[in-house]
Amino acid sequence: IVSGDTKVAGKGQVDGVFITTTGMGQIEDGVNVGGTLAQPGDAIIVTGDVGRHGCTILLAREDFGIEADVTSDCAPLWNTVEAVMNTTHDLHVIRDATRGGVGTVLYEIAEQSNVGIRLDAASVPVAPEVKGVCGMLGLEPLYLACEGRMVIMAPKDKADKIVETLRQCPYSKDAAIIGEVTTDQPG
């Protein structure tokens, strides 16, 4: 696997340096995950609270006149993935929730796997300060970028153990089961 990130900016719009990275790795034998592999009955797990990065960027870029103690959720994900893989290989989807946040990731997976998604809104972890800012600005935290969060879909009988493992990792203390994959309204 090779992945990377690029930025596109108009001439004269950049006043500093962009640092980008490329990651290379391999998928372990016996592991088969992807956006097309979500299955009805899978639990939907998020590795932590949502919307913090997007909220942080909005507050830094725009002059809303709002002061809030919100920090980005930027975090390395490799150790979290490794911990989950050491718990079980019975995983169907692992996706970062960067662009468009958890909501967009769930929409894309539903479309790619031709399944439905049922969320329990009360189970989605959102930091109080992010809730407050989103409430004032009329934003939905599920659709704000997350730079250190993943969405995992796995069989329901594995979900509690996965969440228990995640909560032992330094960047996923607020991991939670937030819903399930269904056959209702596929795609």
Where do the language-model regions lie?
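Helix-biased detector of long, well-ordered alpha-helical tracts
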Residues: V2-G187
